């Protein structure tokens, strides 16, 4: 935020997405966004509170800053969707009037035995039109997106300590071996090896 008398003020944030570079939200964002505040009038009250909180030493300061940055990120994403400035991926798919219904179904009930036909029906499109539109807008096939979304959930549940047997059922896989095959195809490692790697990465990142 800038002031002609006092100059510019900066607040920096580091946002970590689950799955790192494989996160569908992170993949859809442009590498750099520079916007004047005049284009985001709804952000001004939130940013004013954010800057005040950043410069204060109040109780609960970090929790407040985390939540305020989340609000700013959501407002920024909405603005980018309106401008059509996002890359092919989750955000452009959610902005599509028909594809968003299929994406919402995948997100809400990933364990369902989704097929191109059933997803196309939710989108109100024919199978072929849906498959082509999905690939063009989201940047991958419906089956590819479904698997990546499921594996992202599997990674989250592994970190939470859930047993692989329950994870397989919740993620829509018929068995642990079926999940392990899909996981290795996506991540290059077995679920167990991936978890060990992530735990070591977390230890290495500690100061």
Predicted regions mapped to residue ranges:
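Conserved A-loop
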Residues: 158
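Basic/polar phosphate-binding segments, predominantly the helix-turn-helix DNA-binding elements
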Residues: 75-81, 101, 105-149, 162, ...
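PLP-dependent class I/II
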Residues: 200-201
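N-terminal regulatory/effector-sensing and dimerization cores
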Residues: 1-32
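An amphipathic alpha-helical interaction segment
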Residues: 18-20, 38-107
């Amino acid at each position: 935020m800038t002031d002609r008398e006092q100059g510019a003020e900066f607040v920096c944030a580091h946002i970590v997405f689950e799955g790192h570079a494989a996160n569908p939200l992170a993949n859809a964002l442009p590498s750099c966004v520079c916007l004047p505040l005049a284009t985001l009038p709804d952000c001004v009250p939130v940013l004013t509170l954010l800057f005040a909180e950043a410069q204060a030493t109040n109780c609960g300061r970090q929790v407040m800053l985390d939540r305020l940055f989340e609000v700013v990120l959501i407002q920024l994403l909405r603005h980018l969707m309106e401008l059509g400035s996002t890359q092919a991926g989750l955000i452009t798919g959610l902005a599509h009037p028909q594809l968003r219904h299929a994406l919402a179904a995948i997100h809400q009930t990933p364990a369902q035995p989704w097929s191109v036909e059933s997803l196309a029906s939710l989108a109100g499109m024919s199978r072929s039109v849906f498959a082509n539109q999905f690939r063009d807008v989201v940047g991958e096939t419906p089956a590819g997106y479904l698997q990546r979304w499921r594996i992202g959930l599997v990674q989250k549940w592994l970190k939470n300590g859930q047993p692989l047997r329950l994870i397989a059922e919740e993620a829509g896989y018929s068995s642990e071996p079926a999940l392990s095959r899909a996981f290795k195809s996506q991540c290059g490692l077995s679920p167990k090896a991936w978890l060990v790697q992530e735990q070591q990465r977390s230890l290495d990142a500690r100061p």
